[in-house]
Amino acid sequence: MADQKRKLADPDAEAPTGKMARAGPGELDLVYPFWYQVAAPTEITPPFLDPNGPLYSTDGLLNVRLTAPLVIIRQSNGNAIGVKTDGSITVNADGALQIGISTAGPLTTTANGIDLNIDPKTLVVDGSSGKNVLGVLLKGQGALQSSAQGIGVAVDESLQIVDNTLEVKVDAAGPLAVTAAGVGLQYDNTQFKVTNGTLQLYQAPTSSVAAFTSGTIGLSSPTGNFVSSSNNPFNGSYFLQQINTMGMLTTSLYVKVDTTTMGTRPTGAVNENARYFTVWVSSFLTQCNPSNIGQGTLEPSNISMTSFEPARNPISPPVFNMNQNIPYYASRFGVLESYRPIFTGSLNTGSIDVRMQVTPVLATNNTTYNLIAFTFQCASAGLFNPTVNGTVAIGPVVHTCPAARAPVTV
């Protein structure tokens, strides 16, 4: 009878899967039938969700798959989908996406889109090819030209381009020369001179003889700058006479050294035992004058000082670089003569040999000049010893050589 009632109550019910649980004391079991145990709820997936589509569910929530540049933007009133941008793209006040354009640049926006501000004097938009192309505006006769390789410079036979540098093309057989200072002119300095940037032709000699005198005949003015073989400069007096007779230069030199006016004589064996010193005779008084030969007297007065430049000997010594050397100079060549000087006080160096040599000298302006070097070679030491005092005078020391040119006027 009990089985018949159970079937009538639920004819489609399945047989119990487990032991029927009874309500314990104080519990109310409202499940009917009381023996039925509830299984885990079945998750229902709507049939319109494609597992590979942009929508998916997580924990019963519908979600959207996002890829860059779409992102979830967290806001105070809830999350929303937005576009991630950098400084080149912005969202305007109407919520529309737009390109961010710097106000300092040449780009601008119009109703038709983005445009470019250009200088019509230097740039042009060329539409001849069917496409609007930005180009450089070239002047018709401005020496610039364009080709498939780019913009270039049009040059004639007087110019050339070397290592991407525009240069003047100089005829190797001509008188022009190119240096770091620019384009210059090579000329015969016996016939021409440059004065204040102007090339001038030397005037024809107006006299067969020209003379130059400098210093004091009494050897009482120690204005000369001499230098010892220990490379110590000192003061000395001189009297100089030079005569150019139709291209033959005769130089007569007197020298006097007074220990009371020569200046400081350094101590030490190297300095005290020095026996040689050099005097330079120069006709370039402002350009290259190591012994400080003073402005003297010219006869005739319109004679150029270049009239007293000695000619360079074919066997002249190498160029003496005044930029790298103290102006002591001792040549192994040239004329050598022996003299007996006049001494006073305790100073006595014995006889003095003098070697005279025309020497090319590179001055501080990087120009080479011909000077006459007089190297005085004392037989014994004493002149540069601070404990020895007195004077020594020698002269005339005479040197004769060809002049660089016959006497010329200014």
Swiss-Prot record:
It comes from the Viruses. Residues 1-10 have a biased composition (Basic and acidic residues). Pfam families: AdHead_fibreRBD, Av_adeno_fibre. InterPro entries: AdHead_fibreRBD, Avian_adenovirus_fibre_N, Fiber_prot_C_sf. One of its GO terms (cellular component) is host cell nucleus. Induction: Expressed in the late phase of the viral replicative cycle. It is found in: Virion; Host nucleus. GO terms for biological process: adhesion receptor-mediated virion attachment to host cell; symbiont entry into host cell. Keywords: Capsid protein, Host nucleus, Host-virus interaction, Late protein, Viral attachment to host adhesion receptor, Viral attachment to host cell, Virion, Virus entry into host cell. Belongs to the adenoviridae fiber family. The tail region anchors the fiber to penton base capsomers, whereas the shaft, built from several repeated motifs, allows the knob to protrude from the virion. Forms spikes that protrude from each vertex of the icosahedral capsid. Interacts with host receptor to provide virion initial attachment to target cell. Fiber proteins are shed during virus entry, when virus is still at the cell surface. This is Fiber protein 2. It comes from Fowl adenovirus A serotype 1 (strain CELO / Phelps) (FAdV-1). The lineage of its organism: Viruses, Varidnaviria, Bamfordvirae, Preplasmiviricota, Tectiliviricetes.
